[in-house]
Amino acid sequence: MIAYHLYWDLVYLRGLPWAWYNGFWAYIWQQSICCTFILLSGYCCQASRHPIRRGAISFFGGAAVSLATALVTPEEPIRFGVLTFLGTAALLTVPLRPLLARIPPRLGLILSFSLFLLARDVNHGYLGFAWVPLLRLPRGLYSNLATAGLGFPAPAFASSDYFALLPWLFLFW
């Protein structure tokens, strides 16, 4: 993760012309880091003795990053970044813990992974598997900044770090 962010800084903040970084293999690298980070965070949330406190710290840390980027780099704001997501996911998980605990672990793993894959491209307007659209979602869902946090960004929405509840919450659980 540190190496990835070092290269991100060099490419996007320092203007290093490195075409590979915007290619397929860099995307795979980035996604493997994201998925691992979110899976581990979800696991730690389940084991935490203070998930509300940790969720609030993550959420407000993400809010501070969003505010800072809006002020310092308004052309590259971070809206609904990974810290905001992790905090929100932890806070949503707390009241759902009793329900989630009733699901057998193997079934929970299969359901969560399947729902993650199904909702993977919800921010592009559909449910499907591996870039194969199965269900086009209503355009009305993609209307404003609040819906972007859920996973339905409006066409003009922009964020340099975007982790909406859908699909990532399924990976967190």
At which residue positions do the language-model features occur?
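Alpha-helical transmembrane segments and their immediate juxtamembrane cytosolic regions
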Residues: M1-W173
